Swiss-Prot record:
PANTHER family: DNA-DIRECTED RNA POLYMERASE I SUBUNIT 2 (PTHR20856). The keyword Transcription applies. It catalyses: RNA(n) + a ribonucleoside 5'-triphosphate = RNA(n+1) + diphosphate. This is DNA-directed RNA polymerase subunit beta. The lineage of its organism: Bacteria, Pseudomonadati, Pseudomonadota, Gammaproteobacteria, Enterobacterales. InterPro entries: DNA-dir_RNA_pol_bsu_ext_1_sf, DNA-dir_RNA_pol_bsu_external_1, DNA-dir_RNA_pol_su2, DNA-dir_RNAP_su2_dom, DNA-dir_RNAP_su2_hyb_sf, RNA_pol_bsu_bac, RNA_pol_bsu_CS, RNA_pol_bsu_protrusion. Belongs to the RNA polymerase beta chain family. The RNAP catalytic core consists of 2 alpha, 1 beta, 1 beta' and 1 omega subunit. When a sigma factor is associated with the core the holoenzyme is formed, which can initiate transcription. DNA-dependent RNA polymerase catalyzes the transcription of DNA into RNA using the four ribonucleoside triphosphates as substrates. It comes from the Bacteria. One of its GO terms (molecular function) is ribonucleoside binding.
């Protein structure tokens, strides 16, 4: 296996037994690909912006004398880059420019004669762009658009499961769901009549829609029923016989021909009888007259002599009617064939309840249902019906809908029109009647073949189309207004509605969410999330148990583990590791193809629909060396069930054991030994881990850590290979390899690193280089670690030495006892960055001013501010300190004569302004790390703003100069090579300044040309440098675009150092969470025989009932990994020979049974071995993939190699007494996370604070500076104790007795500790409520 530069430094020993057939795909592709399709120009015009434009344009005027046509579009360049947008609070977007053509036709001339054509490019608003990490920057904050899982368009057959009607009868229904347009529902009622609903409105008999489609009663009966022909001859009645139709019926007369009785009266007709009738080729039989009575005629019958209608189609025959027909000379009578078994008379019955008789009355009935209260006209009724399902503007099934529709109706063709046809509606009815007759099955709505993914691109396209449709109306009006000779396309289009629609979607849609940026995993999970909520989806309240449940089709597509606990459980899911979407938006997962029992490496992606037809083996099925199944019977999945199949029957095999889980769950080692409920908590809690000060890779991982860290985009990854030219804390420069360079470029890549920036969750984002000068890197190698990454691997927490034992009750109820050493070594210290903003506005009384001259504030409070009134960078501030001094003008107050006199004597002038400075929130002590000032255009900048500007310009100039220097050096290197090859010695060159080299003449023409080309490049480079500098200077010095009425914004960034303390929440990766109960001195912690104390003591009772045994196995394996690290460390200390070191490390890597990934250290140089050993001395890193991890036996082998007891338990001694504990204790290394539930953010106490407006009771919650609720049950407690005075105090002066609490405050100030309780305000509220009901209550003194 080839290792990258960073991987060589620390290789994970992999315990996986199965080879990786398919690489893990790029984890953010679902977001990036979808958005790419949206903005990419699609020549077919089936998706993206192109599709939206083509669906709305051309727009014709009402008179059709002019039209506006769409030609093409282009996206411009964004004004600010991503970083600048975040700092300025802007949206990262590009202007959309559309080329439109205005065509005016001659009114008098023949149709289509063009009078005038004008073409122009029109600005159509801004389109937010996706960053390379799959996010959007909207108003300066990073947001993610979550994909939605919604019901696919198409036709669905379902039933009410017998819940609607009291009899428990199952009522079937069909629903045609378009991508956009009206829904069409067909449903049976308890009397078996078929009804239709349009858009869930009032129901109508289903035959109304058939009549509206211009079918007569006879046509309808011909469509849905087979016919039976009766003939009257010689006063006898004969019937044309189709023997199969008699099956299952009870004969009401003897069926006999020529004296031979086939079926006796009263007997049921069986298959044997039918075979006999077929054999004897019986086609007609005589039936008694009673047999035809009650049958329904299939057509109209007219008396040919008089032209009078005897009976219309769908009339039941009676004796009288039969006599009439016979008299009128009708010898043949056709009836419809129905029976109680499998040919129900539902349509015939429905026709009887249908009040309409012809097309017009049907259209009028539909119009009345859709538009109640409006008078119907023929034209209006026809237009309405036409627009419902047959107009491309109003109705679209979409390609997906048509494909699902045709598949459901078992048609061969899967493409077709986006609107419905007559045949479509009739076939849906036929299938629904077939299901009612017992043929066919209903659909499963929760099957992933019936639910599809709607990603960012598609949702943005829909929003954009909505905006365009709004514009279309306005354009139509303007085209019809006349005077088109002077108008240009620009005058037709108002971009506001389009911008508004797009802005609304990205800014406030339920699916456009504030990105969870706690750590790299939470980012990646958020982008791979799939929600069933949102517009056009489900709601929490209505979603039942079935929708939330794990469905067999989730396998390999949606993770069965990772979903939130609480009301959203099962509605918000996560994409599985290998899952992706197909062209129709259905989820697919990869499988290896199997031919005659041999598994190949050919990969096929199957969707849930296709998957059902195949037999699929699991990834852990045993194969021999040639890829054949070893066992004859293999556990496989087929049609959602698991069972044993012969190996020849297998069609496909899973790609990987981690195929079924999501990224979050695939990071939990020994997941297969954890209960699913705890695994769910573990996967969710990893997302809440706060990045620690120094990231520490997990000793026991799953091998997914590198993929997550690299794909999340928090690390800095080499775009092209080359050698490292320069490294410092904030920038890396790489000289690109010759073969990866573009022609004519200098071949230098410069990476500027993120330093101490704030994330959405206030955690700290900081990148640290992990390469050295002069080293060779390849494309895709990690150059710098981001937050929570260590050498390019995800590192959410710290490896801690844990012991499972009780310790003086400090680990009661999942509490955690932590050693003081953890705090001293800053293992779980985190940095939080808070942003505080001070806004200076223009008020009615004058503008607010940022200044250090604040009334009634002492010198001490101003000590950390500069002369502009803004805090210094580096100042250490505490709660209540002023960060930005600001004064607000206040209205003049009327002064008393005494005050005027004092004012005159002491000359206090600052009375007309009040202090409104920005202060540090209570309870925060922090360091100021950055200040940014934004000033409105046209407002004079203060001194501090100019200083900051100057500093930024200097920094930019320095950056660009260094960039230029590096590029120049590379270019002059190439110039030197040309000159030397042209015969000039390097000595001569060293005497001349570099710029002069370009003037040197060369004898060879080819060399001279090369030199001139390079000289041109040099001039271009300098010009480019000047241009870049000018652009940056303009951006920095121009005024900022601030909200109306805002003059200036000062943003102060504070860094808060959070050490671990009692009350903080910690967790492992297996759902084992707890709160720190005590930080214990190191000397009191339990220690082993060598005197090494443990770091954390966990409760052993947290394991058995929770059934997350994975944590115990992780602890044992962690102990073994650390033990091997210790042995390597000892060897390094003794300066052992490299060959011995190599041999020991090789032995550790080779351990295990049938491990597929072996490491060959013989290819490593001695230097690389030492570098590897240096990284392994703190513990050997191990990967145990999900469902394919280390076995107990292998853990024991590793413990043995590390000279540790194979039980995984050791004797511990009490740190306080030195006595040995009576039993050996499980001790090992577990990966612990500190979660973003810090006690500092939760701890809160209230002094006098805010009160509710109506009830005058104190508010609740930390954000409102509220108190603790003294609720109903607490009142009962005081009543039970008989503490009357305490109770009175609680319910009056401490709560809502306004006068009482004011009086009490005065009393306390006066030193008088008495209270007088009055009437609580809430009692007055009650009185008012009662009065509002018209009952007057008055209180007597």
């Amino acid at each position: 296996m080839v290792y990258s530069y960073t991987e060589k430094k620390r290789i994970r020993k992999n315990f996986g037994k199965r080879p990786q057939v398919l690489d893990i795909p790029y984890l953010l592709s679902i977001q990036l690909d979808s958005f790419q399709k949206f903005i990419e120009q699609d020549p077919k015009g089936q998706q993206g912006l192109e599709a939206a434009f083509r669906s709305v344009f051309p727009i014709q005027s009402y008179s059709a004398h002019s039209e506006l046509q769409y030609v093409n579009y282009r996206l411009g360049e964004p004004v600010f880059d991503v970083k600048e947008c975040q700092i300025r609070g802007a949206t990262y977007s590009a202007p959309l420019r559309v080329k439109l053509r205005l065509v005016v036709y001659e009114k008098e001339a023949p149709e289509g004669t063009v009078k005038d054509i004008k073409e122009q490019e029109v600005y159509m608003g801004e389109i937010p762009l996706m960053t390379e990490n799959g996010t959007f920057v909207v108003n300066g904050t990073e947001r993610v658009v979550v994909s939605q899982l919604h019901r696919s368009p198409g036709v669905f057959f379902d039933s009410d499961k017998g819940k609607t009607h009291s009899s428990g009868k199952v009522l079937y229904n069909a629903r045609v769901i378009p991508y956009r347009g009206s829904w069409l529902d067909l449903e049976f009622d308890p009397k078996d009549n078929l009804f239709v609903r349009i858009d869930r409105r009032r129901k109508l008999p289903a035959t109304i829609i058939l009549r509206a489609l211009d079918y007569s009663t006879t046509d309808i009966l011909n469509l849905f029923f087979e016919k039976v022909r009766f003939e009257i001859c010689n006063d006898k009645l004969e019937m044309n016989l189709v023997p199969e139709r008699l099956r299952g019926e009870t004969a009401s007369f003897d069926i006999q021909i020529n004296g031979k009785i086939y079926v006796e009266k009263g007997r049921r007709v069986t298959a044997r009888h039918i075979r006999q009738l077929d054999k004897d080729q019986i086609q007609r039989i005589e039936v008694p007259v009673e047999y035809i009575i009650g049958k329904v005629v299939a057509q109209d019958y007219i008396d040919e002599n008089t032209g009078e209608l005897i009976c219309s189609a769908n009339t039941e025959l009676s004796f009288d009617l039969l006599a009439k027909l016979s008299q009128a000379g009708h010898q043949q009578i056709e009836t419809i064939f129905t029976n109680d078994l499998d040919h129900g008379d539902y349509i015939s019955q429905t026709l009887k309840v249908d009040p309409t008789t012809d097309r017009l009355s049907a259209l009028v009935e539909i119009y009345r249902m859709m538009r109640p209260g409006e008078p119907p006209t023929r034209e209006a009724a026809e237009n309405l019906f036409e627009n419902l399902f047959f107009s491309e503007e109003r109705y679209d099934l979409s390609a997906v809908g048509r494909m699902k529709f045709n598949r459901s109706l078992l048609r061969d063709e899967i493409e077709g029109s986006g609107i419905l046809s007559k045949e479509d509606i009739i076939e849906v009815m036929k299938k629904l009647i077939g299901i009612r007759n017992g043929k066919g099955e209903i659909d499963d709505i929760d099957h992933l073949g019936n639910r599809r993914i709607r990603s960012v691109g598609e949702m943005a396209e829909n929003q954009f189309r909505i905006g365009l449709v709004r514009v279309e109306r306005a354009v139509k009006e303007r085209l019809s207004l006349g005077d088109l000779d002077t108008l240009m396309p620009q005058d037709m289009i108002n971009a506001k509605p389009i911008s508004a629609a797009v802005k609304e979607f990205f800014g406030s849609s339920q699916l456009s969410q504030f990105m969870d940026q706690n750590n790299p995993l939470s980012e990646i999970t958020h982008k791979r999330r799939i929600s069933a909520l949102g517009p056009g989806g489900l709601t929490r309240e209505r979603a039942g148990f079935e929708v939330r449940d794990v469905h067999p089709t989730h396998y390999g597509k949606v993770c069965p583990i990772e979903t939130p606990e609480g009301p959203n459980i099962g509605l918000i899911n996560s994409l599985s590791v290998y899952a992706c979407t197909n062209e129709y938006g259905f989820l697919e997962t990869p499988y290896r193809s199997v031919h005659e029992g041999a598994v190949t490496n050919e990969i096929h992606y199957l969707s849930a629909i296709e998957e059902g037809n195949f037999v699929i083996a699991q990834a852990n099925s045993n194969l021999d060396d040639n890829g054949y199944f070893i066992e004859d019977l293999v556990t496989c999945r087929n049609k959602g069930e698991s069972s044993l199949f012969r190996k020849e029957q297998v069609d496909y095999m899973d790609v990987s054991t981690q195929q079924i889980v999501s990224v979050g769950a695939s990071l939990i080692p020994f997941l297969e030994h954890d209960d699913a409920n705890r695994a769910l908590m573990g996967a969710n809690m990893q997302r809440q881990a706060v990045p620690t000060l120094r990231a520490d890779k997990p000793l026991v991982g799953t091998g997914m850590e590198r993929a997550v860290a690299v794909d999340s985009g928090v690390t800095c990854v080499a775009k092209r290979g080359g050698s490292v030219q320069y490294v410092d804390a904030s920038r890396i420069v790489i000289k690109v390899n010759e073969n990866e360079m573009h022609p004519g470029e200098a071949g230098i890549d410069i990476y500027n690193l993120n330093k101490y920036t704030r994330s959405n969750q206030n955690t700290c984002i900081n990148q640290i280089p992990c390469i050295n000068l002069g080293e060779l890197v390849e494309r895709g190698n990690v150059l710098a670690d981001g937050p929570s990454t260590d050498l390019g691997e995800l590192a959410l927490g710290q490896n801690m030495r844990v012991a499972f034992m009780p310790w003086n009750g400090y680990n009661f109820e999942d509490s955690i006892l932590v050693s003081e050493r953890v705090m001293q070594e800053d293992r779980f210290t985190t940095i939080q960055i808070q942003e505080l903003a001070c806004i200076s506005r223009d008020t009615k009384l004058g503008s607010e001013e940022v200044t250090a001259d604040i009334p009634n504030v002492g010198e001490a409070a101003l000590s950390k501010l500069d002369e502009s009134g803004i805090v210094y960078i580096g100042a250490e501030v505490n709660g209540g300190d002023i960060l930005v001094g600001k004064v607000t003008p206040k209205g003049e107050t009327q002064l008393s004569p005494e005050e005027k006199l004092l004012r005159a004597i002491f000359g206090e002038k600052a009375s007309d302004v009040k202090d409104s400075s920005l202060r540090v929130p209570n309870g925060v002590s922090a360091t100021v790390i950055d200040v940014q000032i934004f000033t409105r255009d046209g407002v004079e900048k203060d001194k501090r703003a100019l200083e900051i500007e100057e500093m930024e310009l200097k920094q930019v100039k320095k950056d660009l100069s260094e960039e230029l220097k590096i590029l120049e050096a590379a270019l002059f290197g190439r110039i030197k090579a040309v000159l030397i090859s042209g015969g000039i010695t390097s000595e001569k060159l060293s005497r001349l300044p570099c710029e002069r080299w370009l003037e040197l003449p060369l004898s060879e023409e080819q060399k001279q040309e090369q030199l001139e080309q390079l000289a041109e490049q040099y001039d271009e480079m300098k010009a480019e440098f000047d241009k870049k500098m000018e652009v940056k200077r303009r951006k920095i010095t121009q005024g900022d675009d601030l909200a109306p009425g805002v003059l200036k914004i000062v943003k102060v960034y504070l860094a808060v150092k959070r050490q671990i303390q009692p009350g903080d929440k910690m967790a492992g990766r297996h759902g084992n969470k707890g709160v720190i109960s005590k930080i214990n001195p190191v000397e009191d912690m339990p220690y082993d025989e060598e005197g090494n104390p443990v770091d954390i003591v966990l409760s052993p009772l947290g394991v058995p009932s929770r059934m997350n045994i994975g944590q115990i196995l992780e602890t044992h394996l962690g102990m073994a990994a650390k033990g091997i690290g210790n042995k390597i460390n000892e060897m390094l200390k003794k300066n052992e020979r490299v060959s011995k070191l190599r041999k020991f490390i090789q032995k550790a890597y080779d351990l295990g049974d049938g491990v597929c990934q072996t490491v060959d250290l013989s290819t490593f140089s001695d230097k690389e071995i030492l570098s590897l050993a240096e990284n392994l001395k703190k513990g050997m890193t191990i990967a145990t993939p999900v469902f394919d991890g280390a076995k107990e036996k292998e853990i024991k082998q590793l413990l043995k190699l590390a000279d540790l007891p194979t039980s995984g338990q050791i004797n511990l001694f009490d740190g306080r007494t030195g006595e040995q504990f009576e039993r050996p204790v499980t001790v090992g290394y577990m990966y612990m996370l500190k979660l973003n539930h810090l006690v500092d953010d939760k701890m809160h106490s209230r002094s006098t604070g805010s009160y509710s407006l109506v009830t005058q009771q104190p508010l609740g919650g930390k954000a409102q500076f509220g108190g603790q609720r003294f609720g109903e049950m607490e009142v009962w407690a005081l009543e039970a104790y008989g503490a009357a005075y305490t109770l009175q105090e609680m319910l009056t002066v401490k709560s809502d007795d306004v006068n009482g609490r004011t009086k009490m405050y005065k009393n306390i100030v006066d030193g008088d500790h008495r209270m007088e309780a009055g009437i609580p305000e809430s009692f007055n509220v009650l009185l008012k409520e009662i009065r509002s009901l018209g009952i007057n209550i008055e209180l007597e003194e």
